[in-house]
From Swiss-Prot:
<dbReference type="InterPro" id="IPR003835">
    <property type="entry name" value="Glyco_trans_19"/>
</dbReference>
<keyword id="KW-0328">Glycosyltransferase</keyword>
<keyword id="KW-0443">Lipid metabolism</keyword>
<protein>
    <recommendedName>
        <fullName>Lipid-A-disaccharide synthase</fullName>
        <ecNumber>2.4.1.182</ecNumber>
    </recommendedName>
</protein>
<comment type="function">
    <text>Condensation of UDP-2,3-diacylglucosamine and 2,3-diacylglucosamine-1-phosphate to form lipid A disaccharide, a precursor of lipid A, a phosphorylated glycolipid that anchors the lipopolysaccharide to the outer membrane of the cell.</text>
</comment>
<dbReference type="GO" id="GO:0005543">
    <property type="term" value="F:phospholipid binding"/>
</dbReference>
<comment type="similarity">
    <text>Belongs to the LpxB family.</text>
</comment>
<keyword id="KW-0444">Lipid biosynthesis</keyword>
<comment type="pathway">
    <text>Bacterial outer membrane biogenesis; LPS lipid A biosynthesis.</text>
</comment>
<dbReference type="GO" id="GO:0009245">
    <property type="term" value="P:lipid A biosynthetic process"/>
</dbReference>
<keyword id="KW-0808">Transferase</keyword>
<dbReference type="GO" id="GO:0016020">
    <property type="term" value="C:membrane"/>
</dbReference>
<keyword id="KW-0441">Lipid A biosynthesis</keyword>
<dbReference type="Pfam" id="PF02684">
    <property type="entry name" value="LpxB"/>
</dbReference>
<dbReference type="GO" id="GO:0008915">
    <property type="term" value="F:lipid-A-disaccharide synthase activity"/>
</dbReference>
């Protein structure tokens, strides 16, 4: 079955930088498979714009910072969502694709679906970890889910939601064997000697909560492992400026701050101390021993704890189905505990070999040529709609 030769229109929404990255990957795959005249529009970031995407609103208007911290953004987000729904119903695109940002996109997807516009969602929410009741909203809103992780389709199938496992684009991007020596050369680090990458997050609130603890842990580690060097990526000049007072307060640290290049910094390391998030999956794909940590405001933490199901939060542990790397969260994330755990990860060669095996198996499972698989799934949805037309 062939798609129509008249102009196709695909509406898309990405709500934060990670979604922009995924959506740009999907756009590249779609542009290889759909007519050149296809129009892509909605809400997106710089990576999507590089593919010719027409963004009607700034993506950063949708980027929120947790339950309590997001309250001030709600009125504008609701206004944008209302305008987007009206636009979709007026223009009736061939499909709507929501990329992550479920709290924003599910409502739009339900409106599209109710109007007969196919709704596709890219990135299954972590219903297997917390807020499992969202599966009911997914079943009402989503015609087809594109899943990053292999265990998700079975969960969705039980709720009657069609889905496709497409793998994770990071697994396609990152080589199976990281070039640690080359990364050290690129960053001007010594070829020999222990290196620990420290990643306290990329948001002001994250740095404020966990930054001082991470720096105190680094000071303890340097006392106990005098030859150790640290590398810390700063995603933006603003973040580097935010880190500077902490750097100034610890002049004894053998610390290299890099401008971005977080993947290079992690590749150069022997072990990693990292705030929980997608970056922990990146660290696993780089086959690095790590310690996962986070601190969030008390009320946000209470909400998360009451709605969670799994005993772990780090993606490497979730994918393995067990603790393969330590997690130190909230009040357990003390400088002493973080230093002890990170140095253990650095020094334990048997554990390093075991983790390399576990993470290699994980890498191979997630390496699926995500852009192609996701684009092919979208094309199938468009073809099915064409067949019903």
């Amino acid at each position: 079955m062939s798609l129509p030769t008249n102009q196709l229109r695909l509406a898309m929404v990405a709500g934060e930088p990670s979604g922009d990255l995924l959506a740009a990957s999907l756009l590249g795959g779609l542009q290889e498979r759909l007519p050149a005249s296809t129009r892509y529009y909605g809400i997106g970031g710089q990576r999507m714009l590089a593919h010719g995407f027409d963004s009607h609103w700034q993506m950063d208007k949708l980027t929120v910072r947790g339950y309590v911290e997001a309250l001030g953004q709600i009125p504008e987000i609701l206004r944008i969502r209302g305008e987007l729904k009206r636009q979709l119903l007026a223009e009736r695109p061939d499909a709507f694709i929501g990329v992550d940002a479920p709290d924003f996109n599910f409502s739009v997807e339900q409106a599209a679906r109710d109007a007969g516009i196919p709704s596709i969602h890219f990135v299954c929410p972590s219903i297997w970890a917390w807020r499992g009741g969202r599966i009911k909203k997914i079943a009402k809103s989503v015609d087809h889910m594109l899943c990053l992780f292999p265990f998700e389709p079975a969960i969705l199938d039980k709720a009657g939601v069609a889905s496709t496992y497409v793998g994770h684009p990071l697994a396609d991007e990152i080589p199976l064997e990281p070039d640690t020596h080359g990364a050290r050369i690129a960053l001007g680090l010594p070829a020999d000697g222990p290196v620990i990458a420290v990643l306290p997050g990329s948001r002001r609130s994250e740095i404020g909560l966990i930054g001082p603890t991470f720096f105190a842990a680094m000071a303890l580690m340097q006392q106990r492992e005098p030859g150790v060097r640290f590398v810390m990526p700063a995603a933006t000049p603003a973040l580097r400026e935010l880190l500077q007072p902490l750097v100034d307060a610890h002049p004894q640290l053998a610390l290299t701050i890099t401008d971005g290049r977080s993947q290079v910094a992690m590749t150069a390391a022997d072990a990693i101390l990292v705030k929980s998030g997608t970056v922990t999956l990146e660290a696993a794909l780089l086959k690095k021993p790590m310690v996962i940590s986070y601190k969030v405001p008390w009320l946000t933490g209470q909400i998360m704890r009451r709605q969670g199901y799994l005993p772990y939060v780090g993606l490497p542990n979730i994918l393995a189905g067990r603790f393969v790397v330590p997690e130190l969260l909230q009040h357990f994330a003390t400088p002493e505990a973080l230093a002890d755990a990170t140095l253990t990860q650095l020094r334990d060669d048997a554990n390093r070999r075991t983790l390399t095996e576990v993470f290699t198996e994980m890498h191979l499972s997630l390496r699926q040529n995500t852009a192609a698989k996701a684009a092919e799934a979208v094309v199938r949805v468009l073809e099915q709609r064409r067949g019903r037309a």
